[in-house]
C-alpha cells in the first residue's frame, strides 16, 4: 500500500493531497470535495478506506489553497472544476497512476465540479459517484456528461432529492439515482455512510475501463 502526501503544481497554484494505492489496483478515484471540505474530510476518508479494501486507489485533494478558502470560492464551480482537471492531468502523468482507469467521487458542491470536469475533459473518465451532490450547479453541462453516473441522496435530504431528480433527467449517459432511507445530507445516521461506500465501490468496479 502506497500512502503519500503529494503536491500538484501549475504556474499559479499549488494543491496538496493524499495519494493511496493498494497493491494491484483496479483503478483510481479522485475525490472532489464539497464546500468547506478537503482532504481531511472524515466522511470521504471513510469512503476512501472502503475503496482501498476493494482494490481501488484514491486521491483526496484540497481543491482550494488556504488563501482561497473564503466562502464565495466554495461555490465557484468553474474554478473547482479547473482544479479537478488539474489533478486529473497530474494523475495521467504520474508513473504510478497513469495506466489506471480514472473515476470521480463528488460530495455536495464537489459533485458539480466533478460533473463539469467530465464534460470538459479531453481524456477518458470511467464513472462518477455523487454523494449528497449539487449537480444542479453544473446544470448546463449535464447533457454532455456521458459517463456512467450514480447519484446517491439521503432519504431525508428533501431539497437535494429534488435537485438530483431534475439533474438525473438531464444527464446524457448511463445513470442511476439511489435514495438511501433515513439518511440526511451528511449521512451521519448509523449505517448510511457504509451504504454509500458499498454502492460506490460496486459502481466503480463495474465501470472501470482502460483510459483513452
List where the protein language model places each region:
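Catalytic active-site module of serine/aspartate enzymes centered on a nucleophile-bearing elbow/loop
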Residues: 191-212
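Conserved alpha/beta-hydrolase "acid-adjacent" motif
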Residues: 158-163
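A conserved short beta-strand
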Residues: 123-135
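Catalytic histidine neighborhood in serine/cysteine hydrolases
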Residues: 171-186
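Short beta-strand/loop motif that positions the catalytic acidic residue
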Residues: 145, 151-153
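Short beta-strand immediately N-terminal to the catalytic nucleophile in serine-hydrolase-like folds
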Residues: 103-106, 131
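Serine-hydrolase catalytic machinery in alpha/beta-hydrolase-like enzymes
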Residues: 6-100, 186-191, 195-196
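Gly/Ala-rich beta-loop-alpha elbow adjacent to hydrolase catalytic centers
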Residues: 106-114
Amino acid at each position: 500500500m502506497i500512502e503519500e502526501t503529494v503536491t500538484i503544481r501549475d504556474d499559479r497554484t499549488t494543491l496538496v493531497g493524499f495519494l493511496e494505492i493498494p497493491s494491484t489496483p483496479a483503478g483510481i478515484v479522485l475525490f472532489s470535495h464539497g464546500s468547506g471540505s478537503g482532504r481531511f474530510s472524515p466522511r470521504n476518508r471513510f469512503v476512501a478506506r472502503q475503496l482501498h479494501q476493494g482494490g481501488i486507489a484514491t486521491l483526496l485533494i484540497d481543491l482550494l489553497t488556504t488563501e482561497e478558502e473564503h466562502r464565495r470560492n466554495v461555490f465557484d464551480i468553474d474554478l473547482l472544476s479547473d482544479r479537478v482537471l488539474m489533478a486529473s492531468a497530474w494523475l495521467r502523468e504520474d508513473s504510478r497512476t497513469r495506466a489506471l482507469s480514472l473515476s470521480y467521487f463528488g460530495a455536495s458542491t464537489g459533485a458539480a465540479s466533478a460533473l463539469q470536469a467530465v464534460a470538459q475533459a479531453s481524456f477518458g473518465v470511467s464513472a462518477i459517484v455523487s454523494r449528497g451532490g449539487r449537480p444542479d450547479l453544473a446544470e448546463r453541462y449535464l447533457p454532455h456528461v456521458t459517463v456512467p453516473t450514480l447519484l446517491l441522496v439521503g432519504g431525508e435530504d428533501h431539497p437535494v432529492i429534488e435537485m438530483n431528480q431534475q439533474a438525473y433527467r438531464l444527464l446524457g449517459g448511463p445513470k442511476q439515482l439511489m435514495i438511501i432511507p433515513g439518511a440526511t445530507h451528511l449521512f451521519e445516521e448509523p449505517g448510511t455512510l457504509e451504504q454509500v461506500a458499498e454502492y460506490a465501490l460496486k459502481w466503480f468496479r463495474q465501470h472501470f475501463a482502460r483510459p483513452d
